[in-house]
């Protein structure tokens, strides 16, 4: 089975859950994806927050982006400035990217996708749009015979939850 060496940056709520799932249930990824994920380095601004995972932890996030063994960088730190530097450095170093960072994709997506294209790497960002609904996969794979030039809509989890609550009888009753 093929093995992919991964670096994870960010161990907050999302990053911590990702590390926990990869550590506690690796067989799910192996069985569903046909690949073994080896987390070889973790970048955590507060190093102690990642100690419970018994992994190679650094507080210097760019060390993960510059680690020649890391093949895929999972960016889960949030925000724009540091995340952009981290992703750009990783792409320039030939690493594929996975991110759940809505702000990063909304603000710098076009330039990051162009940089990724130049360096022949992929950016996975499905978790950063539409509240995790697999809309990107549907557009890329399900509509492959169609030419989609532009797509607009309110596609985020917060708005979806808000609209759901507005339609509930308990909210609308007087």
Model-identified regions with their sequence ranges:
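N-terminal glycine-/serine-/threonine-rich beta1-alpha1-beta2 phosphate-ribose binding loop
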Residues: 1-93
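ADP-ribose/adenylate-binding Rossmann-like module
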Residues: 91-107
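Rossmann-like NAD(P)H-binding beta-loop-alpha module
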Residues: 124-166
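Single conserved hydrophobic/aromatic residue that forms the stacking wall/gate
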Residues: 165-174
